[in-house]
């Protein structure tokens, strides 16, 4: 038997906590016997004193085990359970293509996703732009979709890592969100509760990233890879660029439209293709579905070329109560804003930098994201035809097309878009789309 205050005192004094002490505290959070003040105190001591690798693994496992851990054995699946998690960005629509692509190659992807957070878009919000799409199927339906389709993208239920929800809510109001051991445990508790064989992390770097610097992004990626592997889930991470919008669009319906066009081959943004392919390659290699990178890329290209990936996406949409002919008729189902027109720069120049976070907040301001958890979402608004770094813009070449539902919103966000994009006379040095692969 432990006392919560003694566990806090021990960590406050810089001593490592045992696995038993960590489990006691986390179960106390779940069972509401540890107070909000005690959660805040422990979070702050961890923020200042950090945690060793064994402590980080113990914290993650305790949070995972605070609720249901999915078990797929009874389904006798003939392939690995694999997933991807992104730290979030703008125009980061990779999940919608990646899940079907990997499923078409023989993987099973039980993806539990989130809503938009701050300036970053949420996969669930994007999918809810599809009429009827059910992000909360019951457990039996979820398992059946995974068995029959190979991929399902759903929201987190209250039974998965419930201690994390209360812990995170306290961190959010006590300035302890940006602690690497706590971020790591929060992300991985939910992912490991999926019962995965392998995981790939997409950790963003740059002006639209969650972590403000490259070194902090790298630290987070290494922490997640170390803890996840320590917890028995084969995990790698890619550091990918978020110094500009990843896709050609940012918003909900507009990104779903881009995802379908990507899968059918109608249009594939080169940067989006590079990141999506690289993440899929990691999933195929970690899951034992390919011999090497060349083999993985060939398999993935084949399911794009022969239409299997698009077919799997369509089957997932139908299985989750969306339209059965969505892939064929997406334009007749997705909402359209009343006003769509281009925004031009006030002078001619070459785009040298982008405040990607500000562009994400422009989508939120249009109604495409939430300022408060209870805010409704406008699925029709957003940005499309985003200009890239290094593009020369003038009176003919716009910065973006803004989709809004009234002229005032359009005018207001046109100013935000102009202010977020820096023009110069010289073409900027091209930055890599993928900075680094982390395996340990």
From Swiss-Prot:
Establish whether keyword Transport is in the entry: no
**Presence of keyword Signal:** no
What does the record give as the reaction this protein catalyses? thymidine + phosphate = 2-deoxy-alpha-D-ribose 1-phosphate + thymine
Report the Pfam families cross-referenced here: Glycos_trans_3N, Glycos_transf_3, PYNP_C
| This protein's UniProt keywords | Glycosyltransferase, Transferase
Enzyme Commission code(s) on record: 2.4.2.4
Q: Name one GO molecular function term.
A: 1,4-alpha-oligoglucan phosphorylase activity
Provide one Gene Ontology biological process annotation.
thymidine metabolic process
* Protein origin, superkingdom: Bacteria
Pathway listed for it?
Answer: Pyrimidine metabolism; dTMP biosynthesis via salvage pathway; dTMP from thymine: step 1/2
Q: Which PANTHER family match?
A: THYMIDINE PHOSPHORYLASE
What protein family is recorded? Belongs to the thymidine/pyrimidine-nucleoside phosphorylase family.
Q: What does this protein do?
A: The enzymes which catalyze the reversible phosphorolysis of pyrimidine nucleosides are involved in the degradation of these compounds and in their utilization as carbon and energy sources, or in the rescue of pyrimidine bases for nucleotide synthesis.
Q: What quaternary structure, including any partners, is listed in this protein's UniProt entry?
A: Homodimer.
What name does this protein carry? Thymidine phosphorylase
Protein species of origin: Yersinia pestis
Q: What gene does this protein come from?
A: deoA
């Amino acid at each position: 038997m432990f006392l919560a205050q003694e566990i806090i005192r021990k960590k406050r004094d810089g001593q490592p906590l045992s696995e038993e002490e960590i489990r006691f505290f986390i179960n106390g959070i779940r069972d509401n016997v540890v107070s909000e003040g005690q959660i805040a105190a422990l979070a702050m001591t961890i923020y200042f004193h950090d945690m060793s690798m064994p402590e980080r693994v113990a914290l993650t496992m305790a949070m995972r085990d605070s609720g249901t851990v999915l078990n797929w054995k009874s389904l006798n699946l003939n392939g690995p359970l694999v997933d991807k998690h992104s730290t979030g960005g703008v125009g980061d629509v990779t999940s919608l293509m990646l899940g079907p692509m990997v499923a078409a190659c023989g993987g099973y992807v039980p993806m539990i996703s989130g809503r938009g957070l701050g300036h970053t878009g949420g996969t669930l919000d994007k999918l809810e732009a599809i009429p009827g799409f059910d992000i909360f199927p019951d457990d039996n339906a979820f398992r059946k979709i995974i068995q029959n389709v190979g991929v399902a993208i759903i929201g987190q239920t209250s039974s998965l890592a419930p201690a994390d929800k209360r812990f995170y809510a306290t961190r959010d109001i006590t300035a302890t969100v940006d602690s690497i051991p706590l971020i790591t445990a929060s992300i991985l508790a939910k992912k490991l509760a999926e019962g995965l064989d392998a995981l790939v992390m997409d950790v963003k770097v740059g002006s639209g990233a969650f972590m403000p610097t490259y070194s902090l992004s790298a630290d987070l990626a290494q922490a997640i890879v170390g803890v996840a592997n320590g917890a028995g889930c084969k995990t790698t991470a890619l550091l990918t660029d978020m110094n500009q919008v990843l896709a050609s669009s940012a918003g909900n319906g507009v990104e779903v439209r881009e995802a379908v066009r990507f899968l059918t081959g109608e249009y594939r943004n080169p940067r989006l293709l590079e990141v999506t392919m690289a993440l899929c390659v990691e999933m195929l290699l970690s899951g034992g579905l390919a011999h090497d990178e060349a083999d993985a890329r060939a398999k993935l290209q084949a399911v794009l070329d022969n239409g299997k990936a698009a077919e799997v996406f369509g089957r997932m949409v139908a299985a989750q109560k969306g339209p059965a002919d969505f892939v064929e008729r997406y334009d007749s189902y997705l909402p359209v804003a009343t006003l769509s027109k281009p925004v031009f720069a006030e002078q001619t120049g070459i785009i040298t930098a982008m405040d990607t976070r500000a562009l994400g907040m422009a989508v939120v301001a249009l109604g495409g994201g939430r300022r408060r958890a209870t805010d409704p979402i406008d699925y029709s608004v957003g940005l499309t035809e985003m200009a890239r770094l290094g593009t020369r813009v003038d009176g003919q070449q716009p910065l973006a097309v803004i989709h809004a539902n009234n002229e005032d919103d359009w005018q207001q966000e046109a100013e935000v878009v102009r202010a977020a994009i820096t023009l110069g006379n010289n073409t900027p040095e091209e930055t890599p789309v993928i900075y680094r692969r982390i395996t340990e």
